[in-house]
Amino acid sequence: MTDPSPSLPGLRPFLPDDAGALAELCLASIEELAAEDYSEAQQEAWAESIVADGFGERLARSLTLVATVEGAPVGFIALRDNRHVDLFFVHPRAAGQGVGAMLYDAVERLARARGGVLLTVDVSDNARGFFERRGFTALRRNTVTVGDEWLGNTTMEKPLAAPDAGGGSP
């Protein structure tokens, strides 16, 4: 994969052929971006649980958007049931370059346009600040068992303003 920084990312819907590249992107993101918050064993269990059998089908069942640079995926977000941000990953080389913000803003606009009134997410420790900056509030802390490991995450929510009420990202 080339360095994604020289070009602005494009945005497109998930295609079934994306599953392999997005699985690799997940693994790289977990390994490099979550190292400060999760042990190596926790990262491995987390990664294995995400890219298990059915990963492509899971993405296809959701509204999944893919950010690309020069045709290569650099991030993706999956919105389930027009309400829950199910999966959201950015490649480490694209982190901090606005890819995550672009993906999130697009999915929030789509959810609102489709009548969504609330977004929820179970957010990893390293992504909590990203969601707080976008108006999400923490509801509860969770401990999730994955294989022989436990992972901590936080359930967060954000009410969406109606499209005709001047809604938008704060």
Residue ranges and their predicted role:
Residues P13-A19, E24-R93, Y104-A106, L110, ...:
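Acetyl-CoA-dependent GNAT
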Residues S62, G135-F136:
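Short glycine-aromatic motifs
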